[in-house]
């Protein structure tokens, strides 16, 4: 058997994957009451500065009142005062503060903080924390490493401009808490955010450099190897020991061990051993995107090196490396971020070689900046200037790449079976090359076939796949995984807290949004609406309807329109508003933003309609010439018809608007409604008994936030809906609510409780 150790480790990883699939981890429950003040005792295992706070991570935690052991670590947020070294690393402390759990995702595509911190083994946070007692013993080594890191961060702050300092601290010291947000978003959008990860490039450059320096000093090889690995382990501990750093240090140690034992170093075996050791400590790391991307990059470089390799033009080797990494990263990126930066592999042809120069300049900056100013000032500023030039060049390249056509490919999250087929194609290409796709008595001497070489017996040789077949297979796999066809009509009521946002997709793939804002969630556009749209593969909205201009209906849309960095990158073709809109400050700002982006604004009134992809929107309110001083009263009310199913979308309309809409429906001979979006988040001053009696809605959707200060939905509204026999669904209870419409029937699917109900 070739690579027996690698096979054992891979078998372990596969076993872990199967086990996790068959036994998914239950959603963590907060063992202490949310918002309660508690006193905890635990050991300080990590600490770092985040803005004006000291974040301390405690392990082996127990609570005094109520007395219980905490399953997992706790993040404590302390005020960063003059005594920034308290508490010391490795010490046992008692700390008091307010309990805060991690929120779970409530919409498709939304970041799941609860699941993320569950993988990291963190149970909850403690805000407004204060150390009330500290043991005398502590870890001198860990505390020393922390002080070194703080000192080096100070060097960057003194020598570099704030923006450059924040980026260099992230690249060399793993300090991402103060990272410039604009640079972070730009690099992420361009596909070069990997420069912020402490990984193989850092360990290879620093570790091998240090090892070769020791060898030049005639120090015995075993001692050089042990010291070099020890220094890299200390560096990893200092920068936070992420999964990518842990992987790189383990592989570095195995590489030096192979040299000492005079054995051949095998990258794939080292990678498999590193994966097994990490998963033995925490199996759920297998679902961590950082783990997947870090190991995937090395897997692509190692496994696919012979499959995708320029035979004649060696100068194309860097490009072939980017293509190999793309083949492994592509499904991971789509499953995690739902989009792919098309020009990232070209950017990395420049960025990765330049990173060695940037890191070298950063090290000189740190070294010289740590010396007395008389000696180190000039070299530190010179190196700092080089860092600035390189970072400015990176930003310029990223900005230019994002302005190119098709810069960002929004695909959406692929179906699991599509990901499996893509991976199967890549594995088959590897197996076909490694073991031969078939046996031939005599391998062809010319043509496109690649001969593996040694005969297996009686002249038989393994023959690889033709290059054209490889290309066709990869192209077919990429096409398959990037397809995201519409499957009938879908209507999703997003959970935006106290607000409204409705996404509608036609059977033909047209995309519409009705409202998009919240008064209880900040940055709703960035963190909820845009991730949801990209999860569904939406890069362009055919129309956005704003029922009225209250912030809880437009704040997220305004974010998208104000997005100058193009990080949200959702194109809006047209904006539709109520003809009775109040032309106040929000209206003027909206008009200005739309003019800047060249988005036409249409004012709708009763009788107007729009048809697209089998959908029909009909405006029922406001009527022509309707005037009001109330934004809520000016709300658009629309009837949506799709494949024999009808829905009424009401905004925050008030009683007189409901009456006018009801009269129009009655005049048209309309019998009843299937889906009713409750007006004004379930307010008792809307959703009148007369309207509900006329509509007789089969299903009512109420969009409101948990524990909102308005008391929505009001008990009177719920009682009225129950009297009409409506099934009531609330986003505060179920998260996003999706209605799938097919041939006159519809099913209701909820995001949190994962329930499914079929209607009509």
Regions found by a protein language model. Give the residues of each.
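Hydrophobic alpha-helical transmembrane segments in multi-pass membrane proteins
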Residues: 7-12, 180-347, 361, 411-486, ...
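Alpha-helical transmembrane segments of multi-pass integral membrane proteins
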Residues: 298-406, 698-703
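Membrane-interface helix/helix-cap signal primarily in integral membrane proteins
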Residues: 13-194, 527-531, 540, 588-611, ...
């Amino acid at each position: 058997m070739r690579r027996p150790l690698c096979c054992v480790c891979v078998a372990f990883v596969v076993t872990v994957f199967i086990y996790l699939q068959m036994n998914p981890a239950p959603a963590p429950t907060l063992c202490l009451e949310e918002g309660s003040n508690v006193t905890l005792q635990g050991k300080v295992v990590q600490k770092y500065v985040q803005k004006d706070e000291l974040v301390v991570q405690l392990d082996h935690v127990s609570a005094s009142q109520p007395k219980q052991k905490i399953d997992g670590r706790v993040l404590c947020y302390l005020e960063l005062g003059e005594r920034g070294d308290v508490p010391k690393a490795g010490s046992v402390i008692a700390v008091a503060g307010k309990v805060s759990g991690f929120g779970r995702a409530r919409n498709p595509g939304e970041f799941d903080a609860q699941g993320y911190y569950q993988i990291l083994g963190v149970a909850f946070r403690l805000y407004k924390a204060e150390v009330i007692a500290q043991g005398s013993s502590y870890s001198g080594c860990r505390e020393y490493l922390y002080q070194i890191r703080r000192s080096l961060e100070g060097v960057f702050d003194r020598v570099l401009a704030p923006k450059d300092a924040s980026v260099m601290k992230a690249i060399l010291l793993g300090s991402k808490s103060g990272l410039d947000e604009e640079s972070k978003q730009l690099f992420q959008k361009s596909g070069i955010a990997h420069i912020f990860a402490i990984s193989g490039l850092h360990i290879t450059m620093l570790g091998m450099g240090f090892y070769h320096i020791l060898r030049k000093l005639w120090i015995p090889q075993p001692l050089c190897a042990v010291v070099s690995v020890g220094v890299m382990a200390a560096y990893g501990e200092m920068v936070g020991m992420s999964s990518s750093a842990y992987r790189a240090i383990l592989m570095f140690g195995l590489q030096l061990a192979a040299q000492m034992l005079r054995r051949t170093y095998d990258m794939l075996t080292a990678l498999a051993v590193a994966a097994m050791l990490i998963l033995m400590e925490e199996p759920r790391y297998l679902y961590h995107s950082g783990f997947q991307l870090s190991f995937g990059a090395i897997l692509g470089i190692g496994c696919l090196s012979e499959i995708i390799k320029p035979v004649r033009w060696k100068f194309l080797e860097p490009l072939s490396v980017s293509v190999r990494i793309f083949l492994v990263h592509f499904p991971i990126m789509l499953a995690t971020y739902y989009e792919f930066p098309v020009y990232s592999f070209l950017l990395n042809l420049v960025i990765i070689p330049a990173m060695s120069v940037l890191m070298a300049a950063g090290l000189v900056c740190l070294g010289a900046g740590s010396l007395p100013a008389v000696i180190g000032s000039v070299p530190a500023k010179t190196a700092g200037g080089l860092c600035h030039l390189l970072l400015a060049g990176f930003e310029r390249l990223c900005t230019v790449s994002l302005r190119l056509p098709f810069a960002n490919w929004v695909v959406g999250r692929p179906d699991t079976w599509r990901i499996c087929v893509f991976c199967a194609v890549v594995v088959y290409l590897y197996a076909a090359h490694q073991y031969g796709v078939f046996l031939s008595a005599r391998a062809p001497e010319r043509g496109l076939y690649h001969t593996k070489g040694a005969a297996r017996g009686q002249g038989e040789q393994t023959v690889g796949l033709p290059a054209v077949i490889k290309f066709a297979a990869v192209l077919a796999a990429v096409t398959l995984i990037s397809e995201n066809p519409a499957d009938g009509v879908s209507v999703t009521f997003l959970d935006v807290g106290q607000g409204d946002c409705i996404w509608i997709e036609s059977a033909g793939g047209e995309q519409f949004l009705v409202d998009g804002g919240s008064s209880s969630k900040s940055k709703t556009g960035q963190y909820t609406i845009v991730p949801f749209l990209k999860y569904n593969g939406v890069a362009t909205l055919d129309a956005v309807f704003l029922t009225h201009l209250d912030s809880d209906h437009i704040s997220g849309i305004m974010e998208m329109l104000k997005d100058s960095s193009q990080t949200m990158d959702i194109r809006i073709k047209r904006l539709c508003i109520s003809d009775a809109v109040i032309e106040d400050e929000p209206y003027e700002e909206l008009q200005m933003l739309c003019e800047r982006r060249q988005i036409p604004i249409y004012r709708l009134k009763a009788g107007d309609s729009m048809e697209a992809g089998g959908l029909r929107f009909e405006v029922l309110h406001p009527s022509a010439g309707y005037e009001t001083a109330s934004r809520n009263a000016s709300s658009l009310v629309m009837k949506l018809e799709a494949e024999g199913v009808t829905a009424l979308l009401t905004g925050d309309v008030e009683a007189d608007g409901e009456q006018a809409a009801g009269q129009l429906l009655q005049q048209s001979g309309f019998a009843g409604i299937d889906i009713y979006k409750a007006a004004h988040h379930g307010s008792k001053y809307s959703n009148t008994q007369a309207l509900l009696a006329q509509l007789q809605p089969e299903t009512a959707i109420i969009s409101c936030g948990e524990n909102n200060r308005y008391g929505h939905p009001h008990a009177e509204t719920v009682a009225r809906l129950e009297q009409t026999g409506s099934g009531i669904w609330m986003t505060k209870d179920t998260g996003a609510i999706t209605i799938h419409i097919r041939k006159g029937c519809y099913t209701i699917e909820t995001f949190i409780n994962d329930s499914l109900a079929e209607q009509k």
